[in-house]
Structures are given as C-alpha cells and as structure tokens.
Amino acid sequence: MNTPQKPIHQVLLAVDGSEHSLAAVKTVRDMALAATHCRECRVKVLGVLPVSEGSNYAAYMLPLREAERLLNEHSISATADLIQGYPAEVIVDQARVMQPDLIVIGAKGLRATLGILLGGVAQQVIEHACCPVLVIRAPYRRINRVLVCSDGSVCSRKAIEFAANFPFIEGGDFHLLHVLPPSPVLTPELLARVWTLSDDALDPTLFTTREMEAEVEASRKAGDMILHEANELLLAQNIKAKTMLLQGDAATEIIQYASDNAVDLIIAGSRGLSSMQSWLIGSVSRKLVHYASCSMLLVKQPLA
C-alpha cells in the first residue's frame, strides 16, 4: 500500500548560537531547498532568553536574525521569535501551540557540559515533544547517507512513512536495517555453565538442537518480512534502499553499523508515552540519540 504524501509544511527550529544549532539551521535550509513545496514551508526560528538574562535581549536575538537571514536569502519563509523562560519548557510549549510537522534542534547548546554527547535541553525536548524531532550534530554536513531502522512495530512503521516523505537531497544513499534478537536462545545447557542445575533440568528433550535451529530460522524469516514490508514503504516513494539484517543488541548494532558506513542520519521510531512515563522514550531510541555520533531523527508514535 502506498504511503500518503505528507509534506513538511511547518518547522520549529530551535537556535541558541551554538555550533550545533548553526548546523541545524543549515540542515533546515537543505531540507527546504530539496522539497518540491519549498515556498510553502514555514520555519519558526525560536530562541529562548534565560530568565536571568533579561537585559541581554539584543545579544540573544543576533543568532536568530542570522538564521532568519540565511533562510530568507534562499526564499525560505522564516520568522524569528525570542521568548523568555526555560529553554526546553519554552520549546515544548511552543510546539504544542504551533503543532509543527518537525522540531529541529542542535544536539548540544552553548551551556552544555564538556564531553557529553547530548545536551540537557535537546534531551528534554526529545522526551516531551509531541511531534518528530530532528537532532543535528556539529560539524555541519549534508545528509546524504541515511540509515532507517525497522523493528516491525507500529512506531517503526510511522518512522518509515515519515522517512519516505522527508525532503532529502536528491541522490541520497539509503540503508534499511533490522536487528534480530541476540542468539543463542536461552537453554538449560547454557544456564548450566553458570548455575548449578539438577540433572532433570538438563534433560535434552526440553529443548533440542533442532528446535533451537527452528527458532533461529523463524526469527530470520520474520526479520526478512519486516525488511520487505519496510522496503515497500520506501519504494512507494521511489526510494531504493540497501537492506541489511543483523543480529545482536539492537542499539549496539545500529550504532556500529552507522559508524562503519559513515551514516549522516539515523531514523528510528519511538512510542508516545503518558505524562507519568514521559521520562522514557524506549531503551533503543534513548541509546541511539545519546550515543550515535551522527544526527538522529526520532519519530514518535502519538498517544491514542
């Protein structure tokens, strides 16, 4: 079934003057120029004036005006707005009001702790945003090689549909990846290597080698089907991807694959959560956005 075209019309772009936010501005420029509906795209360049910095309004407006200029000179409709408050709270609140198709934010801001891979503001926005979030890492580089992750879930399907309609630079290199669960399957024999088990527990009839092989084969077939269905969604939008089936810890395998193949952007889904659970976006998604060295697009499944 073809994926309906859902172009990105409204973008909320968070800017604070950091190197990462400048890379985010340039990425939004690339997106808008790659989109067939470029002139219909509206970008809100949002800055946050810390409560303690009220007297420095002009200084905080400078990077916003520069971002606005950089976008406007390419005929991209952009307006700048500086709001006083707490950064993550302001960005999330503005997203609720604006209902953008996408939030774009730098991975780290000016005040990020040295050595961390993801700043606190970006982390909070990812956790609480009501729409897809694109986290851009510096230095700026055009998004050419894209890794789309699929696990067969509804959240994953939403991410693939979003990716299929994302305005990438023409001629991009797409990779589609599914990770099978770690092997081997837990058996009494394996447990016996660590635990002291009774002879009855080691009864080979409990789980035979043939049954183990059948489980592995069934898992592989399920993985192939997940890749096939995901690939069909991309092909519906004329996106040809290299498919890859790996096995192991999902986050570890994805991060390693992205590193080995010089991926510019990882795209993954994440389930929407209630306010009680909002600190958790899913263990795999959380690891990817924290530890991947490239930019990350996280597409959240809205709450029912």
What residue ranges belong to the model's regions?
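Structural beta-alpha unit
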Residues: M1-K6, H20, D30, T36-R42, ...
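Gly/Ser-rich helix-loop-strand patches that form or flank binding pockets
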Residues: M1-Q10, A88-Y140, T252, Q256-A304
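Small/aliphatic-rich secondary-structure junction motif
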Residues: N2-A59, H74-I76, R145-R210, L233-K242, ...
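Structured loop/turn residues at secondary-structure junctions
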Residues: D16, I83, A138, D151-G152, ...
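Short, conserved glycine- and acidic-residue-centered signature motifs
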Residues: S21, Y60, L118-A122, S156, ...
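Short, solvent-exposed loop/turn segments at secondary-structure boundaries
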Residues: S55-A58, L70, I116, S278-W279
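A generic structural signal for short
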Residues: S55-Y57, T79-A80, L110-R111, D151-G152, ...
